[in-house]
């Protein structure tokens, strides 16, 4: 059975808001869990990294917002764009932002190192959101 998967990226920072750090992840719409995630800048290369992590899964359709990297990197025959197709992952972004204060936009809780930032967020996702 082929999966329908939502893709999105979420902004955060390390040290100061000028040092942007992005969480890219794929959300399984059937189980409500995270299939794969990666960290990196908001570039096509990071998008390719995420798509490479999804190759073991039988994914029939990928949905995302209209961010340019998805349009360039996701195969056209498997890609749908639009707000209606990303409601679940956007809601999950809010859950992550609420439960992990390092992802909040206006906060005094932030990481000082990229290594700790990625470990804290990665551990949370692996413990609470992999299905």
From Swiss-Prot:
Q: Please give the Gene Ontology molecular function terms for this protein.
A: DNA binding; transposase activity
Give the matching InterPro entries. Answer: Transposase_27, Transposase_27_IS1
Q: Does the keyword Protein biosynthesis apply?
A: no
Annotated GO biological process: DNA transposition
Keywords, sorted A to Z: DNA recombination, Transposable element, Transposition
**What Pfam families does the record tag this protein with?**
DDE_Tnp_IS1
Q: What does this protein do?
A: Absolutely required for transposition of IS1.
Q: Which family does it belong to?
A: Belongs to the transposase 27 family.
- In Swiss-Prot or TrEMBL terms, this protein is called Insertion element iso-IS1n protein InsB
Supply the source organism for this entry. Shigella dysenteriae
- Underlying gene: insB
